[in-house]
Amino acid sequence: MGSVRVAIVGVGNCAASLVQGVEFYKDADPESRVPGLMHVQFGEYHVRDIEFVAAFDVDAKKVGLDLSEAIGASENNTIKICDVPDAGVTVQRGHTLDGLGKYYRMTIEESEQAPVDIVQVLKDKQVDVLVCYLPVGSEEAAKYYAQCAIDAKVAFVNALPVFIAGTKEWADKFTEAGVPIVGDDIKSQVGATITHRVMAKLFEDRGVVLDRTMQLNVGGNMDFKNMLERERLESKKISKTQAVTSQIRDRDLGEDNVHIGPSDFVAWLDDRKWAYVRLEGRAFGDVPLNLEYKLEVWDSPNSAGVIIDALRAAKIAKDRGIGGPVLSASSYFMKSPPVQYFDDEARDNVEKFIKGEAER
């Protein structure tokens, strides 16, 4: 059985949780129900088969460090779940482009080292999958790394809300190159998006007409600080909104009746996120029915529990010679896939893909 050789772009909290998670679950029993994992064994790949072989960042406090040290450096503030041994992987200087917004530049020091040749590193390290963890709003940078993946013939997992897999232009590029992509915008295990989607669909399935809804999110990590720069938020708001409204198939709720997005930065929350969600509808006899809930999560482990499957799905697609969007994995693991399915249907499609019963 082979390994899944992974390169990381952006060694922030999400990368920290992913790297720790692979170590934490390395001895998990494939036959057991393990808290925190949807699949201990994903096809032929166990969690321990994920191997980190390259990492890129632009933060002066991370570039040059071993990956095991960089995940705890600079502004990273997620919860520690285990110790990580020396990885033997030095974080290299990536390309900044539009990856650093105003608040990042106010907070971190950009590395003065020269950027490395990303494509050459991907080839030299024989990378299978490149996972993109760049900050929200990194449109140019995300597309740059997507092109690097294509040029190096490396599968691409797009964890941020820049529309790549979901656009015809980029989907065609990946398809023509024979390179798989899983995207766009990671949907956490049990986060605001997945719970909001489920509740919206529950209203509809039970005969309650959803009239309006909102989702407000606050957090204390660099992701939330970066999103104080509202100019970088357009794709994020679109991604989170369409993830929920896609569950209402027979009508448009109207722009004024849906408000979904990040709201504020609260430093003392660290990597925790608090989501406040409200749904208002009409039930039997046109009587009002309202649901309001609060979700508290550690944001980055919540993401890692899904990325850990997305990486293996991308590797399986690469093994099978599939190019372009992996629709099953994208629809279940991402907020803005090329095709939106109901979550139970998307999950079934993933299981079929693992078994080889569905091409993509």
Provide a role label for each language-model segment.
Residues 136-151, 159-180:
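Rossmann-fold NAD(P)-binding glycine/threonine-rich loop
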Residues 130-132, 156-159, 182-185, 212-213:
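Short catalytic-loop micro-motif centered on adjacent basic/acidic residues
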Residues 10-16, 134-140, 160-166, 187-193, ...:
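Gly/Ser/Thr-rich loops at beta-strand to alpha-helix junctions
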